[in-house]
């Protein structure tokens, strides 16, 4: 990528961060309200925020109770290495010979949900993607991790590669990782 394109990507990313900071929906805490505001769209980008790397889009970052319970760890790394989502992502990275710093992970929904595995009304997920997420694409063809993120991307006509959600209750970690790695290779 040329220096001009890098500057453009960085500028677009800063715009997405500002949009995330401004986005609100009643009933959902913001990252700032939970003590996680930073120069990122999602805290997981502290470790997986490569603006030119493969893009993986999930449903949400975390639920508010888990974010509060693990605040110290999340403030350092932006993710919980021992949860199923991240254990599968680590397997994907090993299969592809990549590190977390080589990829970009983001959710379609940038607010905190009330509990683990919460259902986000489709209208809320679309509103957040319209306000924030579409500005993170930066010309990349994303991998949609799970049906929720794929549904949002389809609603906006975004070309993407579908893959199972890393935390889906289907198959083994290895099976999910293999399918996600294949999707990343096709993106």
Predicted segment positions?
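Short, charged, surface-exposed secondary-structure boundary motifs
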Residues: 169-179
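Short, hinge-like loop/turn segments at secondary-structure boundaries
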Residues: 122, 179-180
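A polyampholytic, Gly/Pro-enriched intrinsically disordered region
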Residues: 180-187
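A polyanion-binding, active-site-adjacent surface
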Residues: 2-141, 147-149, 154-156, 160, ...
């Amino acid at each position: 990528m040329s220096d001009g394109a890098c500057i453009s990507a960085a500028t677009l990313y800063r715009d997405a961060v500002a949009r995330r900071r401004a986005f609100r929906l009643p009933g959902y805490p913001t990252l700032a309200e939970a003590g996680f505001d930073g120069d990122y769209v999602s805290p997981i980008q502290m470790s997986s925020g490569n603006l030119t790397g493969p893009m993986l889009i999930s449903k949400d970052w975390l639920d508010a109770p888990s974010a509060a319970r693990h605040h110290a760890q999340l403030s350092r790394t932006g993710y919980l290495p021992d949860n199923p989502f991240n254990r599968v992502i680590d397997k994907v990275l090993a299969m592809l010979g990549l590190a977390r710093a080589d990829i970009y992970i983001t959710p379609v929904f940038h607010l905190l949900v009330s509990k683990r595995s919460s259902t986000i009304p489709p209208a809320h997920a679309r509103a957040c993607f319209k306000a924030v997420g579409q500005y993170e694409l930066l010309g990349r063809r994303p991998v949609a991790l799970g049906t929720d993120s794929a549904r949002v991307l389809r609603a906006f006509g975004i070309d993407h590669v579908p893959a199972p959600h890393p935390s889906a209750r289907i198959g083994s970690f290895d099976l999910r990782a293999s399918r996600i790695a294949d999707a990343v290779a096709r993106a």
